[in-house]
């Protein structure tokens, strides 16, 4: 009887759990598929720059920093 219980538990509970596709894997795969289709130049353009708290003198302001007051 114990062997039958172990066999049923294995095939009715554990086997279906291993064959299920996890939902958390899908967004990563979709994101990777989208990024894979991009050209290298387009991939480089997607990078977001971290905000910086730098300031520079008004004559040196070129958009990379905020002008100091």
Curated annotation (Swiss-Prot):
Please list the residues that carry the modification 4-carboxyglutamate: 54, 57
Q: Which cysteines are joined by disulfide bonds?
A: 55-67, 56-65, 61-68
Q: Which UniProt keywords apply?
A: Disulfide bond, Gamma-carboxyglutamic acid, Hydroxylation, Neurotoxin, Secreted, Signal, Toxin
Q: Mind telling me which residues form the propeptide?
A: 21-52
Major site of localization recorded for this protein: secreted
Alphabetized Pfam families for the sequence: Conotoxin (PF02950)
Tissue expression pattern: Expressed by the venom duct.
Per the record, residues carrying 4-hydroxyproline are: 58
| Cell location | Secreted
- The signal peptide, as residue positions, is 1-20
What GO CC annotations are associated with the protein? extracellular region
Q: Name one GO biological process term.
A: envenomation resulting in positive regulation of voltage-gated sodium channel activity in another organism
Q: Record's family?
A: Belongs to the conotoxin M superfamily.
Which function does this protein serve? Iota-conotoxins bind to voltage-gated sodium channels and act as agonists by shifting the voltage-dependence of activation to more hyperpolarized levels. This toxin enhances tetrodotoxin-sensitive sodium current in rat dorsal root ganglion neurons.
Domain comment quoted from the record: The cysteine framework is III (CC-C-C-CC). Classified in the M-1 branch, since 1 residue stands between the fourth and the fifth cysteine residues.
Please report the name of this protein according to its UniProt entry.
Iota-conotoxin LtIIIA
- Please give the organism: Conus litteratus (Lettered cone)
């Amino acid at each position: 009887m114990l062997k039958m219980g172990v066999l049923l538990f294995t095939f009715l509970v554990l086997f279906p759990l291993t064959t299920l596709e996890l939902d958390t894997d899908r967004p990563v795969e979709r994101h990777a598929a989208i990024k894979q289709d991009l050209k290298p130049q387009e991939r480089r353009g997607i990078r977001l720059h971290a905000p910086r708290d730098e300031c520079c003198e008004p004559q040196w302001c070129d958009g990379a920093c905020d002008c100091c007051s």
